[in-house]
Protein backbone atom coordinates (compact mmCIF):
# COMPACT_ATOMS: atom_id res chain seq x y z
CA UNK A 1 0.00 0.00 0.00
CA UNK A 2 1.54 3.28 -1.12
CA UNK A 3 1.57 6.16 1.27
CA UNK A 4 1.21 9.67 -0.04
CA UNK A 5 3.16 12.41 1.69
CA UNK A 6 1.69 15.85 1.30
CA UNK A 7 3.95 18.83 1.37
CA UNK A 8 3.36 20.87 4.48
CA UNK A 9 1.53 24.08 3.62
CA UNK A 10 3.09 27.27 4.90
CA UNK A 11 2.25 30.94 4.63
CA UNK A 12 4.68 32.56 2.22
CA UNK A 13 3.91 36.03 3.56
CA UNK A 14 4.69 35.05 7.16
CA UNK A 15 7.96 33.41 6.09
CA UNK A 16 9.04 36.55 4.22
CA UNK A 17 7.88 38.92 7.02
CA UNK A 18 5.55 40.83 4.69
CA UNK A 19 3.78 43.73 6.42
CA UNK A 20 1.25 44.61 3.71
CA UNK A 21 0.39 42.87 0.43
CA UNK A 22 0.67 45.36 -2.43
CA UNK A 23 -2.01 45.39 -5.14
CA UNK A 24 0.61 46.51 -7.69
CA UNK A 25 2.65 43.32 -7.25
CA UNK A 26 0.91 41.46 -10.07
CA UNK A 27 3.42 38.59 -10.23
CA UNK A 28 2.63 37.59 -6.63
CA UNK A 29 -1.12 38.06 -7.00
CA UNK A 30 -1.26 35.85 -10.11
CA UNK A 31 -0.07 32.91 -8.00
CA UNK A 32 -3.23 33.18 -5.90
CA UNK A 33 -5.87 33.25 -8.64
CA UNK A 34 -7.07 30.34 -10.78
CA UNK A 35 -7.05 30.21 -14.57
CA UNK A 36 -10.69 31.25 -14.51
CA UNK A 37 -9.86 34.28 -12.34
CA UNK A 38 -11.14 33.07 -8.95
CA UNK A 39 -9.23 33.70 -5.73
CA UNK A 40 -7.69 30.45 -4.44
CA UNK A 41 -8.84 29.63 -0.87
CA UNK A 42 -6.36 29.57 2.01
CA UNK A 43 -6.97 25.87 2.72
CA UNK A 44 -5.39 25.18 -0.68
CA UNK A 45 -2.54 27.73 -0.50
CA UNK A 46 -1.82 27.56 3.25
CA UNK A 47 -2.00 31.34 3.67
CA UNK A 48 -2.83 32.65 7.16
CA UNK A 49 -6.22 34.33 7.64
CA UNK A 50 -4.71 37.80 8.12
CA UNK A 51 -2.84 37.60 4.83
CA UNK A 52 -5.72 35.89 3.01
CA UNK A 53 -7.90 38.93 3.76
CA UNK A 54 -5.16 41.29 2.56
CA UNK A 55 -4.65 39.12 -0.51
CA UNK A 56 -8.35 39.17 -1.41
CA UNK A 57 -8.46 42.95 -0.95
CA UNK A 58 -5.33 43.43 -3.11
CA UNK A 59 -6.69 41.17 -5.88
CA UNK A 60 -10.02 43.03 -5.90
CA UNK A 61 -8.22 46.39 -6.10
CA UNK A 62 -6.01 45.16 -8.94
CA UNK A 63 -9.09 43.92 -10.81
CA UNK A 64 -10.85 47.26 -10.31
CA UNK A 65 -7.82 49.10 -11.71
CA UNK A 66 -7.63 46.64 -14.66
CA UNK A 67 -4.26 45.25 -13.57
CA UNK A 68 -5.80 41.76 -13.32
CA UNK A 69 -8.71 40.31 -15.30
CA UNK A 70 -12.01 39.47 -13.60
CA UNK A 71 -12.32 36.30 -15.70
CA UNK A 72 -10.25 34.33 -18.17
CA UNK A 73 -10.05 34.99 -21.91
CA UNK A 74 -13.38 33.95 -23.40
CA UNK A 75 -12.88 32.01 -26.61
Swiss-Prot record:
GO terms for biological process: translation. GO terms for cellular component: cytosolic small ribosomal subunit. Keywords: Ribonucleoprotein, Ribosomal protein, RNA-binding, rRNA-binding. Pfam families: Ribosomal_S18 (PF01084). InterPro entries: Ribosomal_bS18, Ribosomal_bS18_CS, Ribosomal_bS18_sf. One of its GO terms (molecular function) is small ribosomal subunit rRNA binding. The keyword Hydrolase does not apply. PANTHER family: 30S RIBOSOMAL PROTEIN S18 (PTHR13479), SMALL RIBOSOMAL SUBUNIT PROTEIN BS18M (PTHR13479:SF40). Part of the 30S ribosomal subunit. Forms a tight heterodimer with protein bS6. Binds as a heterodimer with protein bS6 to the central domain of the 16S rRNA, where it helps stabilize the platform of the 30S subunit. This is Small ribosomal subunit protein bS18. It comes from Actinobacillus succinogenes (strain ATCC 55618 / DSM 22257 / CCUG 43843 / 130Z).
Amino acid sequence: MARYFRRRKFCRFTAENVVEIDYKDIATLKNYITESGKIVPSRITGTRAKYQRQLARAIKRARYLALLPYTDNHQ
